[in-house]
């Protein structure tokens, strides 16, 4: 897969509000159970399971089993850095767009 296709796939995964909420809740480096991630994303456990599988398959997350529970965390610090960078860039872009709209009035 070339770089642009890889970037597009990653962006489409992050673009989903439920998945981005799950990823954002893991930025602190801790592991969270699927049930907690479902609650944080305001989705059913079944829906969360589907989202988590996609994030695992993409390499954004890793999972560890403890008893009957699976705990998820970011696969690498670079995932968190990328998420924070995207959030900062989109925030700056939003502020620039707001400023441009105000100056046109």
Residue positions per predicted region:
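Short, hydrophobic-biased segments on the C-terminal half of alpha helices
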Residues: 52-53
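Beta-hairpin "wing" of winged helix-turn-helix
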Residues: 56-66, 70-73
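Amphipathic alpha-helical dimerization/coiled-coil segments
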Residues: 1-6, 28, 79-105
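N-terminal helix-turn-helix DNA-binding core of bacterial DNA-binding proteins
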Residues: 5-44, 70-77
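Short amphipathic alpha-helical segments, especially helix-boundary/capping motifs
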Residues: 10-11, 45, 59, 100
């Amino acid at each position: 897969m070339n770089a642009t296709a890889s970037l597009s796939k990653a962006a489409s995964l992050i673009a989903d509000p439920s998945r981005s909420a799950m990823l954002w809740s893991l930025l602190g480096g801790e592991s969270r159970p699927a049930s907690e991630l479902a609650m944080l994303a305001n989705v059913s456990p079944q829906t969360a399971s589907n989202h988590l599988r996609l994030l695992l398959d993409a390499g954004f997350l890793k999972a560890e089993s403890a008893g009957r529970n699976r705990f998820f965390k970011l696969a690498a610090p670079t995932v968190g850095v990328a998420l924070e960078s995207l959030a900062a860039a989109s925030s700056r872009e939003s502020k620039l767009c707001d400023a441009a709209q105000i100056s046109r009035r």
